[in-house]
Amino acid sequence: MVLGLASFPESLSSQSETATQPRRPSVKWDLGSDYRKGTEETTASGSNFRRERLDSQPDLGLHVQPQIYFLRPRSPLPKLLFSLMNTNDANVKKLLPKSHLSRVIIRDNLNAQRICEMEMKASDKTKRKMSYLYDHLKKKFMMDQLRKMIRWRRDSQSTQDYLDKERV
């Protein structure tokens, strides 16, 4: 607080100097600067900023506006499309970042592929069993029909013989 009072007379002289100088705009479009350089400047100026309450500081009447820098937007990262089908692990490791998450994703995809293959094998096995069962039931039905026909013929034969004797 004492420092603020000590700089009070200097601020009066700087106020008269700012009145004669033309006002600079508070916003600068600095598209030529690098992103990292701009962040270093803002952090350096932020470290010198005194953290006191605004009402505790006397109004010096400097009318100094803060400088705002708009940084150049970052270029987007190119999107990569890849499939784990028909690729070896070396190519996949080149594309994915070196983290544990990429290994988990690869392992999870391989597990999903194994589960899918197991389900396909089980469904094929079930289809084969069902086709064998269908063939078996079809054959059984045909044999039952044939036995019925033979039994009816045998039963009807005795009746037919009796009717033939009666006609004669």
Swiss-Prot record:
Name residues in a coiled coil. none
Task: List, as start-end ranges, the regions of compositional bias called Polar residues.
Answer: 10-23
Family annotation (Pfam families): DUF5528 (PF17666)
Region feature (Disordered): 1-52
- For bias type Basic and acidic residues, the affected ranges are 31-40
**Which named protein is this?**
Uncharacterized protein C5orf52 homolog
